[in-house]
């Protein structure tokens, strides 16, 4: 079965072909136009998707060495996401499905991220037939979920203010780094001292209110941003420049330690032996290393996507559509546009 996946929920225009569960192409066009604005401009994102969608889809089909008529299913992100961006991809998918007389499978963007750790480029690979704890962490979402064998899930924690990826980007902006700042902080942190300065870790065992949040898996990163802002304001610019790598490493340590602590704690509480980490922040080398060490120390299996599948991509859309179709948990030919659909209602 050949599935074409289309992803346009934010600022990546992506198309992918998955053949019998195996990725045979994955084209991603990132919109650099937003860099000068320090963040994604929704209207510009929609226009860029309109400009790029045809060429990106054609490239994905060509790289898979098939023709459009060889496609069996069209899958596209149907939300959550920027309404205009989602509509570009989903409307294009609707039109293509109609012209080719193929079924359309709308895919929840967050669900696709959850299972991106199981994307494969070879045969005989499938998500584990066991429950696992999912940490989904990106610029727009930070949440913990218990995922069952039948693909159903329960959200047990989420950010109460800023997402982890947003914390990376906004603290990076305070430090004068280019957008998106997350990857820049990651590179700087590699040569810095994570213990240089201890920034706050809210709702954890290190916070003053730890007793109140011992069994709470929510996240909070607004206090970290405020702390970084005050810290920078007290320092001479030359001091910040000299210690930029150390400050970046300290920020990364504060964010990733919270993510790891809560994820492992959730696995212990729910007596689950596997953890999946997904979303754009899962590409962060500090998080990957820290989570791997914690999982090994606690006897937990870790599933984490290749960096190319961590950020928004269509391979995860097509792969999740294939998984749902093969498990009989979805019905194609649904054409609803739901750019603001909640995560839970899509399960």
UniProtKB/Swiss-Prot annotation:
GO terms for molecular function: iron ion binding; N(6)-L-threonylcarbamoyladenine synthase activity. Pfam families: TsaD (PF00814). Substrate binds at residues 136-140, 169, 182, 186, 284. It is found in: Cytoplasm. One of its GO terms (cellular component) is cytoplasm. Binds 1 Fe(2+) ion per subunit. It catalyses: L-threonylcarbamoyladenylate + adenosine(37) in tRNA = N(6)-L-threonylcarbamoyladenosine(37) in tRNA + AMP + H(+). Its EC number is 2.3.1.234. Its cofactor is Fe(2+). Keywords: Acyltransferase, Cytoplasm, Iron, Metal-binding, Transferase, tRNA processing. Fe cation binds at residues 109, 113, 312. One of its GO terms (biological process) is tRNA threonylcarbamoyladenosine modification. Belongs to the KAE1 / TsaD family. Required for the formation of a threonylcarbamoyl group on adenosine at position 37 (t(6)A37) in tRNAs that read codons beginning with adenine. Is involved in the transfer of the threonylcarbamoyl moiety of threonylcarbamoyl-AMP (TC-AMP) to the N6 group of A37, together with TsaE and TsaB. TsaD likely plays a direct catalytic role in this reaction. This is tRNA N6-adenosine threonylcarbamoyltransferase. It comes from Chlorobium phaeobacteroides (strain BS1).
